[in-house]
Regions:
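The C-terminal output helix
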Residues: 114-121
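C-terminal output helix
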Residues: 86, 104-114
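Short amphipathic alpha-helix used as the core "switch/output" element in two-component signaling
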Residues: 36, 58-73
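Acidic, metal-coordinating helix/loop segments flanking the phosphotransfer/catalytic sites
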Residues: 15, 27-45, 53, 69
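Two-component/phosphorelay signaling modules centered on CheY-like receiver
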Residues: 8-26
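Conserved acidic carboxylate
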Residues: 5
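Alpha4 helix (beta4-alpha4-beta5 surface) of REC/receiver domains from two-component response regulators
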Residues: 58, 62, 83-100
């Protein structure tokens, strides 16, 4: 699993939780770092924040495009505080299989991952 999140406290909490759940977890805090990892590692799932730079840029959509190009079998989930309907439609059109608002309970994120992975098999 690859977690892409710019907030260090949230990234650490997510990594700890999913490691305890039995996932192998890599982390990235920036778009370029995420792209480098996706280009060199085969992930079952990528969970990405929509906005990474603290600006209005939507790097999460670029990550979805990159996953689609480099690793089409990888499942993608967006976890974000920015949940406008237009953004959700764009994310789904680029391959996001789930769009979760922040905050979402960790157990619900885990259930979403398992659901997405079950559909993939």
């Amino acid at each position: 699993m690859l977690l892409v999140e710019d907030e260090p406290v949230l990234l650490s909490a997510l990594k700890k939780f999913f490691t305890r759940e039995g996932f192998d977890v890599d982390c990235a805090r920036e778009l370029e770092e995420a792209e480098a990892l996706i280009a060199t590692t085969c992930y079952a799932v990528v969970i990405a924040d929509l906005r990474l730079s603290g600006t209005y840029a939507v790097e999460g959509l670029a990550i979805l495009r990159f996953v689609r190009s480099y690793s089409p079998a990888t499942r993608s989930i967006i976890l974000t505080a920015h949940t406008a309907p237009g953004i959700q439609r764009s994310a789904r059109a680029l391959g996001a299989e789930a769009f979760l608002p922040k905050p979402t309970p960790l157990s619900e994120i885990a259930a979403t991952i398992h659901r997405v992975m079950a559909v993939a098999s």
